[in-house]
Amino acid sequence: MHYSHFYFIINNTNMTINAIPKLFATKNSISLSIVIFMYLLILVANVKSDSSFNFPNFQPEALKKLGFANDATLKNGVIQLTKKDAYGDPLKHSAGQFGLLKPIRLFDQTTGKVASFVTEFTFSVNSNGRQDHGDGFAFFMASPKFKIPNKNKSEGGFLGMFTRETALYTKEIVLVEFDSFANEWDPNPSSNLGIGSHLGIDVNSIKSVANALWLNDFDDITVGKARIEYDSSDKNLKVLVTYSEKGAFNGDSSLVYNIDLTTFLPEMIEIGFSASTGDLVETHDILSWSFTSNM
């Protein structure tokens, strides 16, 4: 089953104002203009800045709110970001993305208010018993102008969001990566992070500005749960991951980075997930997703 691609294009909502009688337009055009202007200000002031949604699983009706690109598909209530064969085994050289069609407001330039948000999701990354596997997935926040690259250029360590040309400099994109393979731009194997899987925060580049060890289990029956928080008051972006059956965030893996997101992202942003495989493979499935923001 194939779904329409997700191109990070905001769907504008048109607001229609009833026609104004010509009598008022000719005699009181200035006064009427002021009234209309004040009315529109009231409308804008009362627009709800909070955003929230919850997908405990992904049913076909979710397609009304979600967009897909490249290899990402919805199957049996689960979003598969990268390709599998008929037996469920992961395939090489795959990349896929999905995200919310409706943009999220990160901040209000007029009032200066900035949103705080929490997003939680459950995921499964299965190596199918391979000792060497890759490449990982990421939660992204990006400008609506950002264009998802072709999978042939963004596979492998680029996590489906970068290419060789854009890897070290891309505008208006922030990723939280769940990286299962250490590339040359990742933490040095001699560092305290060791070799292999790690959490990372990427700002306009595939090279992370912050890293932490990703303690994981790539068994096919293991489900991980992640929580990403942004507190606009202290500007901390926090990542928590657990494999606890109770879903409690008990510090299995964590990463905190101080960042003013408004410096790197526009008022309205697109949010979603991306993943890729290269010569090494693993599955990348998102099982549930919720998001709440308030300003």
From Swiss-Prot:
A GO molecular-function annotation: carbohydrate binding
Disulfide bonds: none
Origin: domain of life: Eukaryota
Induction: Accumulates in roots during colonization by arbuscular mycorrhizal (AM) fungi (e.g. Glomus intraradices).
Membrane topology note: Single-pass membrane protein
Glycosylation sites: 152
Record key words, sorted: Glycoprotein, Lectin, Membrane, Transmembrane, Transmembrane helix
Cytoplasmic side: 1-22
Protein purpose: May be involved in arbuscular mycorrhizal (AM) symbiosis with AM fungi.
The protein's name: Lectin 11
Native source species: Medicago truncatula
Organism classification: Eukaryota, Viridiplantae, Streptophyta, Embryophyta, Tracheophyta
Encoding gene, per UniProt annotation: LEC11
